[in-house]
Amino acid sequence: MFTGSIVALVTPMDEKGAIDRVSLKKLIDYHVASGTAAIVAVGTTGETSTLSHEEHGDVVMWTLELSDGRVPVIAGTGANSTSEAVSLTRRFNDSGVVGCLSVTPYYNRPSQEGLFQHFRAIAERSDLPQILYNVPARTGCDMLPPTVARLAEIKNIIGIKEATGNLSRVSQIQELVNDDFLLLSGDDASALDFIQLGGKGVISVTANVAAKEMAQLCALAADGNYADARRLNQRLMPLHQKLFFEPSPIPVKWACKALGLMATDTLRLPMTPLTRAGSRVVRQALTDAGLL
């Protein structure tokens, strides 16, 4: 459940900005049918930063309800306050989620020791499997391999979503951790190379609109069929790149609407709708990928 193509699911909203349960079910059904390995609910792509705490919990619980055991659900529970991250995590202790994805604290930029103590505190207060999430471009904080290795010694810290795009991190972390510690890419454009170097999958933005293709890509790579995997990845590469043409999840929500996967591409401020120029670029990427 923690390997292969794991989607960082968008949070669909209606025209007034309320959570759209009908579209959420449609998205979940699409991922079940497409072979997505697991769903991350309310991560960065799910607009965690603009949801209230109540909405955050509601979306995770609705995702569990609507998936109805057909696909594992991972809850996004990161925060830049340790007490808040602990509270979010404990909220889902007996919910049915299979684990939590917890991003490094953002804006306050803790030291490596601060990062260690932050994640240790979360793990000590929940039995749920914890996946660390390192994305310095968004957080301003880079969790280095020696810190990851220290955290990997804690029983329920089972892996990391590594989204630096720096492929050398794979071997650097592998040298310091046990073989059962999961390395997951957080960068679609380099995910295939990441897997070839020893990663076990990707937590993917692209999978929101190319779920079947991303599941196939990961399966081919896991089987060692890199020639076919590369051909598929080459077709998807414009999509990997252009879904970040404007700040994510702006382009991917527009793409989900364009493919009929949800009713609107509504976002909440400070996220704004995709520009006309952006829509042309993303539409072309969808066409190049054979999705339109």
Swiss-Prot record:
SUPFAM superfamilies: Aldolase (SSF51569). GO terms for molecular function: 4-hydroxy-tetrahydrodipicolinate synthase activity. Its EC number is 4.3.3.7. Keywords: Amino-acid biosynthesis, Cytoplasm, Diaminopimelate biosynthesis, Lyase, Lysine biosynthesis, Schiff base. Pathway: Amino-acid biosynthesis; L-lysine biosynthesis via DAP pathway; (S)-tetrahydrodipicolinate from L-aspartate: step 3/4. One of its GO terms (cellular component) is cytosol. Pyruvate binds at T45, I203. HAMAP family: DapA. NCBIfam families: dapA. This is 4-hydroxy-tetrahydrodipicolinate synthase. It comes from Sodalis glossinidius (strain morsitans). The lineage of its organism: Bacteria, Pseudomonadati, Pseudomonadota, Gammaproteobacteria, Enterobacterales. The gene is dapA.
